[in-house]
């Protein structure tokens, strides 16, 4: 796509300098920007806050982001606020995100919710390129925005595609389409009367069935405590996926945070850093 057609674009490379992970080759323009990295609690892992300076995604907007994590580097990415998709009467909003992880690299991407308002159309395509020793933790939260009638599913559609490659081999293709006009969103097989959706991927060489069972034991009790549905499944590689249905964003954020904290403590032997957004 011609660069002039992007509403916002961002390129970021992180490498390990022998002491800590640092950034280089940062480029952003128009509606996307990245804030100078911070090292929370004297961590060696930089945290980058990605910002949409326009405040929301509008009709026909197109965004592109490319992140490279070099050998032995680690990075945390997050957003500064929710991604708000307003009504798109003519053209849907498109977002393309590519993540390239080299040997022993680790990417932690924990974004705020994607909120689709009445008559919104949103398409997101993520591509993850990993090596055998690369690691990834990635989350998404989908939330219905305000509508005049108060109904939850008044957006036109939300279409999210995630492709995960390891050593150039496609190991996971996740194609999620929520289209209230053509699907019975509240029925079994879709949202099952819940209004909010959350998901996570974790890929690491140490992932096995024992670890997956342990993660599930950590989060399974929340299904009754918060009236939500939680499921975890092994990916066709050394990783797992988590799905959550709930009625509130905060419930999904809490469960995903527990999973992220479990991974930080049990895989990386570190405490999870509070992102200090507010």
Swiss-Prot record:
It comes from Staphylococcus aureus (strain MSSA476). UreD, UreF and UreG form a complex that acts as a GTP-hydrolysis-dependent molecular chaperone, activating the urease apoprotein by helping to assemble the nickel containing metallocenter of UreC. The UreE protein probably delivers the nickel. One of its GO terms (molecular function) is nickel cation binding. Its main location: cytoplasm. This is Urease accessory protein UreD. It comes from the Bacteria. Disulfide bonds: none annotated. InterPro entries: UreD. Keywords: Chaperone, Cytoplasm, Nickel insertion. Belongs to the UreD family. Required for maturation of urease via the functional incorporation of the urease nickel metallocenter. One of its GO terms (cellular component) is cytoplasm. The lineage of its organism: Bacteria, Bacillati, Bacillota, Bacilli, Bacillales.
């Amino acid at each position: 796509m011609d660069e002039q057609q992007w509403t916002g674009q961002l390129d970021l490379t992180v490498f390990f300098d022998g002491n800590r992970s640092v950034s280089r080759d940062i480029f952003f323009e128009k509606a996307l920007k990245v804030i100078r990295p911070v090292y929370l609690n004297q961590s060696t892992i930089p945290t980058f806050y990605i910002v949409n300076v326009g405040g929301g995604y509008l009709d026909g907007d197109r965004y592109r982001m490319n992140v490279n994590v070099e050998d032995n580097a680690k990075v945390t990415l997050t957003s500064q606020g929710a991604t708000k998709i307003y009504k798109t009467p003519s053209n849907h909003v498109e977002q393309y995100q590519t993540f390239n992880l080299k040997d022993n690299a680790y990417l932690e991407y924990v974004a705020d919710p994607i909120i689709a308002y009445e008559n919104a159309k949103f398409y997101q395509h993520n591509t993850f390129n990993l090596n055998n020793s690369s690691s990834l933790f990635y989350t998404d939260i989908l939330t219905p925005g305000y509508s005049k009638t108060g109904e939850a599913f008044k957006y036109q559609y939300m279409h999210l595609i995630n492709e995960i490659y390891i050593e150039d081999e496609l190991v996971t293709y996740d194609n999620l389409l929520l289209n209230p006009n053509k699907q019975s969103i509240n029925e079994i097989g879709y949202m099952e009367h819940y209004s909010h959706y959350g998901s996570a991927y974790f890929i690491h060489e140490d992932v096995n069935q024992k670890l997956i069972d342990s993660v599930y034991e950590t989060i399974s009790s929340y299904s009754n405590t918060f009236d939500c549905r939680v499921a975890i499944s092994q990916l066709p590689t050394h990783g797992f996926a988590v799905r959550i249905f709930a009625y509130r964003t905060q419930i999904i954020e809490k469960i995903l945070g527990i999973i992220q904290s479990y991974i930080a403590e049990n895989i990386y032997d570190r405490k999870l850093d509070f992102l200090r957004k507010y």
